[in-house]
Amino acid sequence: MAPLLGRKPFPLVKPLPGEEPLFTIPHTQEAFRTREEYEARLERYSERIWTCKSTGSSQLTHKEAWEEEQEVAELLKEEFPAWYEKLVLEMVHHNTASLEKLVDTAWLEIMTKYAVGEECDFEVGKEKMLKVKIVKIHPLEKVDEEATEKKSDGACDSPSSDKENSSQIAQDHQKKETVVKEDEGRRESINDRARRSPRKLPTSLKKGERKWAPPKFLPHKYDVKLQNEDKIISNVPADSLIRTERPPNKEIVRYFIRHNALRAGTGENAPWVVEDELVKKYSLPSKFSDFLLDPYKYMTLNPSTKRKNTGSPDRKPSKKSKTDNSSLSSPLNPKLWCHVHLKKSLSGSPLKVKNSKNSKSPEEHLEEMMKMMSPNKLHTNFHIPKKGPPAKKPGKHSDKPLKAKGRSKGILNGQKSTGNSKSPKKGLKTPKTKMKQMTLLDMAKGTQKMTRAPRNSGGTPRTSSKPHKHLPPAALHLIAYYKENKDREDKRSALSCVISKTARLLSSEDRARLPEELRSLVQKRYELLEHKKRWASMSEEQRKEYLKKKREELKKKLKEKAKERREKEMLERLEKQKRYEDQELTGKNLPAFRLVDTPEGLPNTLFGDVAMVVEFLSCYSGLLLPDAQYPITAVSLMEALSADKGGFLYLNRVLVILLQTLLQDEIAEDYGELGMKLSEIPLTLHSVSELVRLCLRRSDVQEESEGSDTDDNKDSAAFEDNEVQDEFLEKLETSEFFELTSEEKLQILTALCHRILMTYSVQDHMETRQQMSAELWKERLAVLKEENDKKRAEKQKRKEMEAKNKENGKVENGLGKTDRKKEIVKFEPQVDTEAEDMISAVKSRRLLAIQAKKEREIQEREMKVKLERQAEEERIRKHKAAAEKAFQEGIAKAKLVMRRTPIGTDRNHNRYWLFSDEVPGLFIEKGWVHDSIDYRFNHHCKDHTVSGDEDYCPRSKKANLGKNASMNTQHGTATEVAVETTTPKQGQNLWFLCDSQKELDELLNCLHPQGIRESQLKERLEKRYQDIIHSIHLARKPNLGLKSCDGNQELLNFLRSDLIEVATRLQKGGLGYVEETSEFEARVISLEKLKDFGECVIALQASVIKKFLQGFMAPKQKRRKLQSEDSAKTEEVDEEKKMVEEAKVASALEKWKTAIREAQTFSRMHVLLGMLDACIKWDMSAENARCKVCRKKGEDDKLILCDECNKAFHLFCLRPALYEVPDGEWQCPACQPATARRNSRGRNYTEESASEDSEDDESDEEEEEEEEEEEEEDYEVAGLRLRPRKTIRGKHSVIPPAARSGRRPGKKPHSTRRSQPKAPPVDDAEVDELVLQTKRSSRRQSLELQKCEEILHKIVKYRFSWPFREPVTRDEAEDYYDVITHPMDFQTVQNKCSCGSYRSVQEFLTDMKQVFTNAEVYNCRGSHVLSCMVKTEQCLVALLHKHLPGHPYVRRKRKKFPDRLAEDEGDSEPEAVGQSRGRRQKK
């Protein structure tokens, strides 16, 4: 056993026969006769070039490696049991696996199997153990083998490190640095770092033992022999055996393999060879032929053959070992230069030297190496074994070059070396002759004989360009070395050294003959070396001058390069800014996108309409879906449009969303059916189909357009997109919406969207969003201005401070220096004197403590300020982030309500769309031009390429959103350079989808950056890249699908449930006489046909008590009598009117019944049933009643309703209490006539009974007629266009009839009679009656004033009343208060109403008249404010006629004075006053 030199074993000197050793090396006991040999060997052993064979530690001295091997040997004796040796060595011998794999395999074999000869315990019982020894291992059965293979595959390995790799890395590192003479201390530190005790296992291994569990034993069966007795027990399972000795860990196994085997060669597949002694000891089987495995070993063991064959490569094995080692070492070895043309080969067996019986001694071998190489090279030669070029040709091919090598050496020597000379002196002669062989500079230029030998022996190295014959060996070596190692990082420093050496040796001619790749490298290195020489010979002044010139030249070059680069960039920029017609440019073809997937039955051409509807719902979701319902998506809508049964719920929900906004707008005020507004009819999923048909009738559109044509503004533009073909509406009369075709459904949806776009709600919504956006921008600009002002102030302040510091700096510095000097001078002697005194020491300590305390306080204060500043900065940062977020959201919402435009167009005029998340993906629209679009451009005019959106948008079916937005893209590009020469072609409208990031990147790559259209498209796509990627990912999400539902069955079921619900509520609320609920329910459930349902609805209407009906179903039997009752002519007119109205009611009811009988769809029946529901006074229902006295619900059997005021009373809450419900009509004490109340109290006043009765009759009749008037007032709006206010009807219905009654004619005579002086004395009854009448009149007044306030509220909401809502300011009109002396506006009137300033209706009307008079006086004829005044006054008159019919409105209109007269005499004219908005000034 001996340490390794490189990767080869270095043989020890054999003991001298029969002589006493003169010089002995202590640790190896090698003996030498001469001091020279001894010292040479000691010097070699002291160098750090040795490697421990057992541990792989490198950079050691021979003694350190030797001691480490001895330590490993002792460790193996202790830790590695002998019975594992054969098991492991059989696996290792001739194995080609790596060391780590061998260690893992051997360790796993040891851990999962008992070895033959292993001593262990055999468990017989629970506590009985027998000492046994393993004799035989039975092989596994097939099933067990398969199971163990799986287990062994998954077995875990303990962590370990590869010593070979570590040694190689360390040697590589040492090879990169040229080793010079180093300190002994440095050598010791390197030694300590490199040395590694084998007994100290790594911590990673110890930790690993805790982390993982050892593998389980394989289910082998064993034959065991008892140690105490000579008995063998067969087939013992592994579970019954217990290991007594700890098996070796992986580190120990690694030491064992390295200690007893060596790898034959340096290749990855080189076999491991176990020492011969152990092979013989354990009879290890050979897996290769001995000669094939190691021809050198074979020759060494057969010396007679070697002597005969002088041309064999192993004539001199010690020399072969040396040459192999040198081939793995640094390329600077001159011995390699002469043989660079030869083929490299693998070294033989590492054990060959040890066992060889060659005549050449190791001293001769070392002496040769010492004389050939410098000491610096020796370091790299021996301790850096690397897989160089020789490792590339293993196996048999290594024979030939070695033979050639030996042959060439023999020829060059001119003699044969015997190889078995034992004398060291003879050995020392051979290196001298070989030194001549090694220096072949003369040979390369000399005889032909010398140059032929290397060429014959293997040829030149393979290079890309064959070098010239006469290239020096240094150049040849560089070419070969560069080719083999140019791409290797670990060889970079070595390659640099070779290049430097070659650059020094070669002449300029030789450098010129090098290959191109190497020529530049060598030339640059040569110039660098020459520069270093010149630099070394320069003086300091010359160097400074040289550097100065160099800098100037460099600056000049840099300036020139920068100038050239700027010019080049400017030219490139100008070239890139040029734009050309896309179709005239040549570039990559655009990628082919796939068509948008649409369900069966929905053609691809309709996708644009689907996207338009969904995008409209998404953009206006704040208006249409304020309660944040589930959004409508394009995929679901397409499925609903094409589905047979699944689309009912989804489509009707879309219709409900759209109609909710449309019917509540002023634009739908005139939409009605059978005298009832559509907004009054309940809007549900089941009635929406019929309501859509009623909304889209042409009659409604024509009435609306005719009515709005009279307006002065442009609100009433005629749109064709909001109309639907009559065929579709006729189909809706006989079929439901979900039963139409996909195209018909889509056309109806788009028409509804366009109709909603015309509403005032949408206009208000857009204005609100834009106003919010403008306010956000104002805030942003204000914040930016404030920040800029702060920065400017800080900058100014800093400049002033710097100027002050510059002025005072010099003086202060001068004074400060002198003061400091004085202080130092004064202070020093004080310190010296005070240091000697104890008192001064105490004082100084106190002063230091006080100073430290102050410093702590200062630090705490500074820390507190710092924390506060940080908190303030964090608060400001959060505030800014929130403001930025609100700003971005507001701007995005403002953009949403504007016209949606495409991202851009490509060379073929295809449009690219990116919609909201509900329509995910990047869409490409082809064939979007149709007949209604006038697409043209003008070569001479750069301002217009399209005739304008207004020219074609009204005629386009998809002009408002989504599908066909304006062509702003082309317009924007044409304003810069008018280079477009092509127009889009008409064709089939198709939609394509880009649904992957790869396709998007490919599209961006194909778009031409200089195309007039594609350049803009590319820029916008790149800008919105992340948004597009997000949309593409959303498009990949699976659709949840629609809920399947049979539409007809759904309509039928809900019609039944609605009928049952109405009947039940009528019965429970006491509003009608309905048969038994169970019988009615059974009858309704049995109905199937529409005709039967119609009869049931008609019967249900007939069962409602007449006085609980309202609207067109309310009876009109009594009308209000005029105040002039004596006129017979007026009575006749009144009778005629009464008859006409009764006929109208009867005809409206008959029309309703006829419509029910003729209904052909369930949705139509739902609408007609909804009309009946709206005509029932549900607020009169007993279900909602509370006792007026105790304000409690419950005890319905004891609750009674007043037939006049409909208020509820408990029987026991009345005074006097009632004990049972009275028959017939009943009135509460407040509604009872005065006579009845007096009679009930037992008082008799016969003198006034007749007059009171007549008064009561008249008042009762009058109150009934007035009540009937109020019931129908919400259904008769005299030409007004206000939004419906359903809540007002509920307020009016709870007003007591006594308060609603008009002025009673019998009150005035009473008051006059009471005022006469000769009247009889007033008794208590008359006082009571007087008080009662006063209360009634005050109640009536307060009710009328309440109605005035409601009228004013409606007037303020009226859209034409905007000029009169607030007072006019001086900013709006400077001369307003010079003309108008009594200004008045609705806000002032509202304030007076809320403060109770008005005592009568006439005072209220006076102020209202003043508002309109002011407007007439101030504004000129034709003013927009005057038109608003006329409409607002008409609205007021209609509301007064409806709510306060007893108060006529008459205002005398003033003639307009000339302007001068009005200005001069405006203050003196009492009636020439008015009010208007200052924004409409006089012309």
Curated annotation (Swiss-Prot):
There is a cross-link at residues 826, 853, 1043, 1089, 1107 (Glycyl lysine isopeptide (Lys-Gly) (interchain with G-Cter in SUMO2)). It is found in: Nucleus. One of its GO terms (biological process) is chromatin remodeling. The modification N6-acetyllysine is found at residue 1335. Its cofactor is Mn(2+). The modification Phosphoserine is found at residues 152, 158, 161, 330, 345, 347, 349, 361, 374, 699, 705, 708, 716, 947, 1315, 1342, 1468. SUPFAM superfamilies: Bromodomain (SSF47370), FYVE/PHD zinc finger (SSF57903). It catalyses: L-tyrosyl-[protein] + ATP = O-phospho-L-tyrosyl-[protein] + ADP + H(+). It holds the Pfam family WHIM1. Component of the WICH-1 ISWI chromatin remodeling complex, at least composed of SMARCA1 and BAZ1B/WSTF, which regulates the spacing of histone octamers on the DNA template to facilitate access to DNA. Within the WICH-1 ISWI chromatin remodeling complex interacts with SMARCA1; the interaction is direct. Component of the WICH-5 ISWI chromatin remodeling complex (also called the WICH complex), at least composed of SMARCA5/SNF2H and BAZ1B/WSTF, which regulates the spacing of histone octamers on the DNA template to facilitate access to DNA. A motif (C motif) lies at residues 207-213. Changing residue 338 to A: Loss of tyrosine-protein kinase activity. Atypical tyrosine-protein kinase that plays a central role in chromatin remodeling and acts as a transcription regulator. Involved in DNA damage response by phosphorylating 'Tyr-142' of histone H2AX (H2AXY142ph). H2AXY142ph plays a central role in DNA repair and acts as a mark that distinguishes between apoptotic and repair responses to genotoxic stress. Residues 20-126 form the WAC domain. This is Tyrosine-protein kinase BAZ1B. The keyword RNA-binding does not apply. One of its GO terms (cellular component) is pericentric heterochromatin. There is a cross-link at residue 826 (Glycyl lysine isopeptide (Lys-Gly) (interchain with G-Cter in SUMO1)). PANTHER family: TYROSINE-PROTEIN KINASE BAZ1B (PTHR46802:SF1). The modification Phosphothreonine is found at residue 266. Keywords: Acetylation, ATP-binding, Bromodomain, Coiled coil, DNA damage, Isopeptide bond, Kinase, Metal-binding, Nucleotide-binding, Nucleus, Phosphoprotein, Transcription, Transcription regulation, Transferase, Tyrosine-protein kinase, Ubl conjugation, Williams-Beuren syndrome, Zinc, Zinc-finger. Residues 148-165, 172-195, 788-810 have a biased composition (Basic and acidic residues). Its EC number is 2.7.10.2. Residues 145-212, 302-333, 379-432, 446-470, 788-817, 1237-1326, 1455-1483 are annotated as: Disordered. One of its GO terms (molecular function) is histone H2AXY142 kinase activity. Residues 604-668 form the DDT domain. The gene is BAZ1B.
